[in-house]
Amino acid sequence: MDRLNSQDRFARLDWTRIAAELDAEGHALLLQLLTADESRALAREAAAASGLPPCVQAWRPVLYGHLLALANRWREHMGMQPGLPSRFEDFMRQGRQAGQTQPQPQPQPHLLRVPQAGHAPLRSYSEGAAVFPLQLVLLLCRPGQDFEGGEFVMTEQRPRMQSRPMVLPLGLGDAAIIATGPRPVRGAAGFYRVHLRHAISRVHRGEWLGLELLLHDAPSAPKALQTDRWL
């Protein structure tokens, strides 16, 4: 799994395009981030691990570096100060000092498993003082072969408007960068906040297996994890 540690897979991405799509929609697809073989190998390793696999742990500071400018711009547009630290290690230290020591999601950090007839309810990860507004999701199984149903769904709630649903068409090895919760949207009178949540619809056959990589930890008793469970 050493090749999964490589920073090259992220360095070769079009981060200008990714930032533009995140500004416009709150999500950006990363098609074929992993090959089929890499996806299967990572699925086996993630299922056997008690936490985040080491090969993916190395992705966190890399993603942080690529997304930091956008994250700080979002914070500024939402009236949040001060800016995030330039180093991922310093950001994590801020979280620990604020009591954010709980890996997420639970019950198995970072691994998403939704069995047949199950679904994942709408949720977001915006609890705590040190929150990074973006995260990665990655599909480790093949739609139509390993499972049926199980669409990755996002909803965007805007002030005084109906919620906007979105379906992300993920395939084996595809990833997406999505907002963890609030994000700014430019309106006629300036920027305003919208809130995004994500879910996995009912799995009709097989098992949905993926990875959810957050760049911040949760408080010891976060509200989101108490009220929303993977079913």
What are these model-predicted stretches?
Residues 1-231:
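Fe(II)/2-oxoglutarate oxygenase catalytic core
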